[in-house]
Amino acid sequence: MADLKASVEVVGEAWKKSAYYADAEQWTFIFWDADQPFRPFFDRLDLRAVLELACGHGRHSEIVASKSSSLTLMDIHPENLDSCRVRLASSGNVRFLTNSGYDFAPVEDGSLSAIFCYDAMVHFSPDLIASYLVDAARVLKPGGRALFHHSNRDADPDVHYGQNLQARNRMTLARFAELADQAGLMVMDARPIDWAGIAKLDGLTLVRKPRIHHRVLRSLRGLFASRSEKAPRHT
């Protein structure tokens, strides 16, 4: 727990007060235009009860609020949520939660149909991503999905992420898939993303919480296959 809190401090401090939030507004279209890679992935989410992780100043939240029955905005910085409250003042279906930086508490077990996180997890260290994936399996409903925009750069772990290209932390599509599997989530789709003119700098991964734990499902399939092989064959 202490190590996770230390990682949150390293990753989160730079974004408490940053010019990024104002600058990023002009690039919001990248995530929502139909000819961009993000939109087809997002359209596969069930938005009845959706949470945006690391919502910042709400540039995506503003778009999603009108599409969702229930939208939860989550951020480690209360100041960001204050900005979102102003921005979404006319939306009656939104709740605002400050979180730890490594899990979805206080969100209730099995209460979300979807989670998404854009342009934030690219900076998260692997231990934080692993922790979030484990808790995503807790808060998602069976069959619920989560869409994560993350780094695809196998960066030097001994170098501060802020010194990397576009401040990307250490993560790859393959490693993300491993962490999702360990958390009990199934990868539905994943692809590399070009960012700031840098080929395949990022990854986009869509995961699903199975209605039956995928490891149990594998065991059952193995059992049925074994029984089928042992069954007498009639000629």
Stretches found by the model and what they are:
Residues 61, 109, 119:
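Conserved acidic functional residues
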Residues 1-49, 53-106, 124-130, 135, ...:
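Class I (Rossmann-like) S-adenosyl-L-methionine-dependent methyltransferase catalytic domain
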Residues 105-115:
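A short acidic, Gly/Pro-enriched loop at the edge of an enzyme's catalytic core
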Residues 114-127:
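A short SAM/SAH-binding and catalytic strip from SAM-dependent methyltransferases
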